[in-house]
Amino acid sequence: MAKMIAFDEAARRALERGMNQLADAVKVTLGPKGRNVVLEKKWGAPTITNDGVSIAKEIELEDPYEKIGAELVKEVAKKTDDVAGDGTTTATVLAQTLVREGLRNVAAGANPMALKRGIEAATERVCQALLEIAKDVETREQIASTASISAGDTAVGEMIAEAMDKVGKEGVITVEESNTFGLELELTEGMRFDKGYISPYFVTDSERMEAVLEDPYILIANQKISAVKDLLPVLEKVMQAGKPLAIIAEDVEGEALATLVVNKIRGTFRSVAVKAPGFGDRRKAMLGDIAVLTGGQVISEEVGLKLENVGLDLLGRARKVVVTKDETTIVEGAGDPEQIAGRVNQIRAEIEKTDSDYDREKLQERLAKLAGGVAVIKVGAATEVELKERKHRIEDAVRNAKAAVEEGIVAGGGVALLQAGKTAFEKLDLEGDEATGARIVELALEAPLKQIAINAGLEGGVVVEKVRSLEPGWGLNAQTGEYVDMIKAGIIDPAKVTRSALQNAASIAGLFLTTEAVVAEKPEKEKTPAAPGGGDMDF
């Protein structure tokens, strides 16, 4: 495939054109009075949204160079959304201003590398200032406010605050689609994993199709159990103790399964067999978690433990085990709190080390099952389109609320950036083009507030000057057009969202300014199909 190459100013300008087209479509959605954007779908009704990432994802430009420019800014929005669940439009607006002002200076003869260094130094200083002015989230109301702003719905904010209240900071909150209208919150006590009973004959409550064991022993085995002779010694000991038995193993099959089922049907002995969750190393880790939680040990040939030699001391205990067709819940495991805390710290250390988003998500889930709990928010809506958009918004709001708890909150509405800039630039000592880079950042910090004001039908420049003259923490409530104490009025952003937006925007701006060539694929001209043969035209 042939390639095209553009150099220097022509390359940078082409990238900028692509970026501007995407940014102009996204920035109209910023703020409480943000406008909507209609997205055409190949099939079905068009989607109407004011979510920055959804709009950015839909934009595909025809010109190859412009397309690359737009893709770079999409990356800013996506990265900010992944990290903090919000701030995508803010990041796009910041990136557009940084690039526009930066390219203007490069065209005037400034050194791109010096500008980049200046932008990076100023960004770092502003991020420090943001974290200094951030306030810790102390009340449930503050979490609700933050989540409400992200989701654009106070009911959603309240529900997320309630979920976080119940499952704690380490807990996992998932969002699922529901068949009914409205919102539902479902809380899980204890550890739950997605594996159900191996045979429906284990069911103790036929109405709810559940197997419920009170105060059971729990056998945790990282192996298949098929021979009954391996299982008999354990069964006899548990029967003598007069307790039921829950078996969590790689698989239970053959005569071992038949023996358990027959004894259950006869009423001789209550038990339930469940396949272990996960695969490979992840299964091993999750069985280890269950063992720590219940105070048992994983029975495995690797550690020299054979099934036939297992005593009651190697089995776990719990107040209750509830098993349905699809999932198992262990309530109040009898594990040693110190060992559980040690395991939690070990998982936390793994989370910090990992580079993979998927691994991080799975580790977070394991952490929640051990330390916190799991809450499920079920979302319903009238149409498929509305359901998808609503679910996406609520997922963002959950990440947003978690970000607020992590790094604290700052005044929303573009005010925090403006005020962090005030203190940050006093301490900066740069010269030449590096100082110009810092001034570009100073200019960019006004952009989000300006855009919020413009979207609300106000004069951006006038609003920025007015907010500059107000005391710290005060700004424009674009919903009412009044100037208020932002945090008291509940107009807040997580510091992590604002920080991520600026860092990601500055990172892309640096790439734009230091680009000297762009290589793109040459668009192929569509070949006209050959005309069909006309025969001999003999009539």
UniProtKB/Swiss-Prot annotation:
The lineage of its organism: Bacteria, Bacillati, Actinomycetota, Actinomycetes, Acidothermales. Signal peptide: none annotated. Forms a cylinder of 14 subunits composed of two heptameric rings stacked back-to-back. Interacts with the co-chaperonin GroES. It is an enzyme of class 5 (isomerase). GO terms for biological process: protein refolding. It holds the Pfam family Cpn60_TCP1. Belongs to the chaperonin (HSP60) family. PANTHER family: 60 KDA HEAT SHOCK PROTEIN, MITOCHONDRIAL. It comes from Acidothermus cellulolyticus (strain ATCC 43068 / DSM 8971 / 11B). This is Chaperonin GroEL 1. The gene is groEL1. It catalyses: ATP + H2O + a folded polypeptide = ADP + phosphate + an unfolded polypeptide. It is found in: Cytoplasm. Keywords: ATP-binding, Chaperone, Cytoplasm, Isomerase, Nucleotide-binding.
